[in-house]
Amino acid sequence: MKKFILGLFLILGAMSFAAPKFVDMAKVKNADYVIKNEREDILTMAISDDDSAIIISFSTANMSSKEISDLLKSNALHNSENFIATLDNNRAYVNEFEAQGFYSYIIVPKKEKVKNQHTYATYVSSKKISKNDLSKITNAILDEAESYIK
């Protein structure tokens, strides 16, 4: 029995250190997000309702924000998403796509809160978002994502 309990604590301890170190996992676990991918170099979490979904990722990739934005754009194109536009605002690079009646907006902040630690998000909606509304949504999503950074 003692070995079982010790093993359980070792497993739980290993799981708690499986996400990037700059992410506040206690806060993430208390949020309504569903964790989709949890490794030492990346954490991806998602939340959705009837009309939209938000996917937030934290990564330790050794790339610039622009390189990450371009890579995510390339990956989306390979997944048969139709590229619509790149929208550049003061805070983030935003790539807009359409696929199967849904619009997705890949958001990569230009400046990272922690050096060499990246945050990026995808907002998916059944409706095309106006540029003005997209700016507000981008700021809200990035504020939300950054609230999970230590």
Sequence positions of predicted segments:
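Signature of long, low-cysteine stretches enriched in small and polar/charged residues
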Residues: 77-115
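Glycine-centered tight beta-turn/hairpin loop motif at sheet-sheet or coil-to-beta transitions
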Residues: 28, 48-53, 99-102
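Short N-terminal segments immediately surrounding and downstream of signal-peptide cleavage
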Residues: 19-41
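Surface-exposed amphipathic alpha-helical segments
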Residues: 29-33, 122-150
